[in-house]
Structure formats: structure tokens, C-alpha cells
């Protein structure tokens, strides 16, 4: 049974899931808006909101914390210096998910996730 389980497995091993979320987060930070599957978007929202909250502090330790998750200098720098300061007065809710369409190949629901 999966009662009260904390996250979605997305049909992947833990290392594959970690790499997927890291790559989706980097893409979202670089492009400010991406289109992906609805369940990937919902998992990414949790992942990126925690990173954005940590990055709002803006000091060296925040840089280190975010870099430990992303392993990408450009994305880390952009999140800490450009994106996170915009949300200094906002307590969570930094992203928006909108269902868009169905994928033609397998009819799965797609959604766009973007920074508010």
C-alpha cells in the first residue's frame, strides 16, 4: 500500500528520478517555462520550490546548497541572483502549472510549468 507516501516514483529508479528532476529544474531555470508530463511537472514543482526558498537567502551557503542539487554553475547563479530575489516577499507558490494538451503518441496529459 502507498498510503501517505511522500513523492511520485515516476516509474524510475531513485537515481534516474533524481537525474530527471535535476535536468527538468535546470531547463526550467534556463527557459523560465517548459512543457512536460503533468506528473513530472507536479514533482518538479515540489523540487524547484524548495530550491527557490533556499536560494532566497542569497548568501554563499545558499549558493552551495542549490549547487549541491543542480550541479550546474549557470543555473545556480541565475536562480540565486535573478529568480529568487523576485520572490523575497512571497511565501511559496513560485510556480504555476497549466494543463495544455495530450501527447499524440501515447495520449498522456501534458502541462506547462513556469515561474509566476
UniProtKB/Swiss-Prot annotation:
Q: Which GO terms describe its cellular component?
A: cytosolic large ribosomal subunit
**Looking at the keywords, is Methyltransferase present?**
no
Pfam families, from UniProt? Ribosomal_L17
GN (gene name) = rplQ
| Family membership noted in the UniProt record | Belongs to the bacterial ribosomal protein bL17 family.
The record's InterPro entries line, in alphabetical order, gives: Ribosomal_bL17, Ribosomal_bL17_CS, Ribosomal_bL17_sf
Could you give a GO molecular-function term held by this entry? structural constituent of ribosome
- Protein name stated in the entry: Large ribosomal subunit protein bL17
Note whether Kinase occurs among the keywords.
no
Q: How does it assemble?
A: Part of the 50S ribosomal subunit. Contacts protein L32.
The record, for PANTHER family, names: LARGE RIBOSOMAL SUBUNIT PROTEIN BL17M (PTHR14413:SF16), RIBOSOMAL PROTEIN L17 (PTHR14413)
Keyword terms, alphabetized: Ribonucleoprotein, Ribosomal protein
For this entry, list what GO says about its biological process: translation
